[in-house]
Amino acid sequence: MPSAKKTLVNQMDNARHIMLLLVIVFHLFVYNYVLNLERTRCDCSDNWQREFIKYYSLVALVISTSLFITGFSGSNVRLPIAFSLLFSLFGLINAFVIFFYTKNLMDAGSACDCSGGRVRTAIHYLSAFRVILTLFALLSAIFFLVFLRAFV
């Protein structure tokens, strides 16, 4: 029978793989949407935000896929802390950019029919959820740091 520690480590690895898979699916979804806007020459969606979203999603896909594949190979590869923090910061910025980008496209309404549809709406709400989740995690981390410091 495996020890409790080994079981916990396996469960954490499984959760990590599931999270990475969700990140990969989300960024594939976003990257495909942005590429479709470019292919259809949707002028109302053409700005710096679209370029930022496209390139960030591409980088996130490469990094997440690499971590996903190496995780299944048995390697316990982790990103360096500084790079992980930088990637997380840009991830939060990306979530805000996607949220406001899709909000502006939604506000344009019939003036921007080329960007419409359920995909845009889904990306908008997923990015809002991502912002809320990230802010909750940040506030939780600050709370635990303050709480733990009081007991040390």
Indicate where each model-derived feature is located.
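Eukaryotic polytopic
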Residues: 2-152
